[in-house]
């Protein structure tokens, strides 16, 4: 049944769906007089990513009254020995017919997970979250985004975090998913090597989740010459990671940033001695220990 009276429609979903063609596209077809459409989706695809050709065929050509189309679609694709994998250039080229919008696309492939990802969105980006950013992140200013997650099977280097801080100046929550060690490491003893580094500022950051990150990323955020953390930070991290990065809670170069932690969710470190070492090092923080497997 058609819905001709509907002029504006928005659909936001952070959960994956594999029913894009079966449910979402037919739903939009019913809105024959739609003038404004907002789609924010994560779609699991079987054969190909969602791109400009798909949106033109299934959305734009069907909605003749449409004058504003805002979208943020991240599609996922299993890697099954496909003969051809589309590139970011292919994805961007599919939007050549979008005359009234600046469209950004970012295509990535993850061999370990055997999965591909294509993130397409109209810019300026209106959402409050930006998920699974990779090293291919194309820059830009995202002043509405408050929650960010990073994922890649290649390491994130210091320069990448500079880019993230500049692109998301009002970021409040950051989650890092990356088990690959950094290639370009710097030590507080190597002062000559560190001269070109600038301590990255995250003035609005309130929650930093490093549960699924290599130790190097805890070091990236806790070393004072790499990062200047804000006060009242909530840190989620494994006890073993924190112990190694702080040299068993004796390292001076991590002491300043650790002093800014007000809440910390820590997995492991169940002995009374371990707990006391951490509490002495992060003296002002409320620490919640869990028995999660590290």
Model-assigned labels for residue ranges:
Residues 1-294:
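Eukaryote-biased activation of long, low-complexity terminal tails and linkers
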């Amino acid at each position: 049944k058609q819905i001709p009276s509907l002029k504006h429609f928005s659909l936001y979903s952070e959960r994956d769906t594999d029913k894009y063609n079966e449910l979402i596209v037919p739903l939009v077809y019913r809105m024959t007089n739609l003038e404004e459409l907002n789609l924010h989706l994560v779609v699991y695809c079987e054969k190909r990513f969602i791109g400009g050709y798909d949106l033109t065929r299934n959305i734009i050509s069907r909605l003749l009254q449409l004058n504003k189309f805002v979208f943020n679609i991240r599609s996922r694709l299993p890697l099954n020995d496909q003969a051809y994998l589309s590139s970011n250039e292919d994805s961007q080229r599919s939007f050549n017919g979008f005359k009234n919008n600046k469209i950004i696309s970012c295509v990535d492939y993850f061999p370990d997970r055997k999965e591909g990802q294509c993130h397409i969105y109209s810019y300026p980006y209106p959402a409050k979250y930006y998920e699974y950013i990779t090293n291919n992140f194309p820059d830009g200013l995202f002043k509405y985004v408050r929650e960010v997650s990073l994922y890649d099977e290649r390491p994130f280097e210091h320069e990448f975090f500079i880019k993230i801080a500049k692109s998301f100046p009002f970021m409040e929550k950051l989650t890092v998913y990356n088990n690959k060690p950094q290639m370009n490491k710097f030590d507080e003893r190597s002062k000559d090597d560190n001269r070109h580094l600038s301590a990255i500022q995250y003035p609005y950051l309130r929650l930093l989740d490093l549960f699924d990150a290599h130790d190097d990323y805890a070091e990236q955020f806790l070393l004072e010459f790499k990062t200047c953390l804000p006060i009242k930070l909530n840190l989620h991290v494994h006890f073993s990671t924190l112990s190694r990065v702080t040299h068993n809670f004796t390292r001076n170069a991590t002491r300043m940033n650790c002093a800014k932690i007000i809440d910390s969710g820590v997995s492991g470190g169940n002995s009374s001695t371990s707990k006391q070492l951490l509490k002495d090092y992060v003296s002002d923080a409320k620490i919640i220990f869990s028995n999660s497997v590290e």
